[in-house]
Amino acid sequence: MHFKDKRVLTIKTTDDMLKILESKGNPLKDFKKGTKITVYNKMEQGYSYVLAENPGENMGEDFKPYYTPAEMLALGCFEGKYFNQNLLEFPKEWFINAIKKGKLSPQGANPECNYFKVKSRLTLQEWKDYGWVPDDDGKINKKHPILSDPNKNPDAGGIAIWFFRHWMGRRIPELDEIQIKRWKAYARHAGQIKANCKPGDLTCRPRQRQSLLQWFYKADI
């Protein structure tokens, strides 16, 4: 299996992505319990993990995400920009399908790639300021000591990259418990939509619906 290619650091177009995927992409069937994955992108280099479960299996009794990572990418999330340098870390089918659907935009964040065609996320720097991901200077956030600690949270890209890796089969019990609690708390946004929108009216609260998709909750409620 291939996990490192310097071309991922200079991706400009979906054609660049397809060339890498065609020559070095890893199919889903090759990922299984015991597979060691090496991460290589601009944000994360030198990190690796071993799958403790087969992809999509035994994610936790109280963790039942509505979407799979493949479905999230195909529907459109994070302006088509977020996961593009992780194309060798995850199954190539995910990216090829999303490219075919016009949902990836390596040349720059594009809200039109989102399912609801609106921007619905904070910046990475804001995530760092809140303590949801490790900061560049290694400062520990008192409110979120585990999430902000680079020695305990290897996911520089936040809860979505945590979910992709968790779905694949990585397990970090302490971190997993925290992220699943955050995910469960996010259900309040679904409650707000149900309280303020007619069922199936996708024009009502599109930003909040997009955020639900990006937190792996059913968005077309």
What are these regions (language model features)?
Residues 154-221:
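Low-complexity, intrinsically disordered activation/interaction regions
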Residues 10-154, 170, 188-207:
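Compositionally biased, intrinsically disordered low-complexity regions enriched for acidic
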Residues 2-4, 17:
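Long, compositionally biased low-complexity regions that are usually intrinsically disordered
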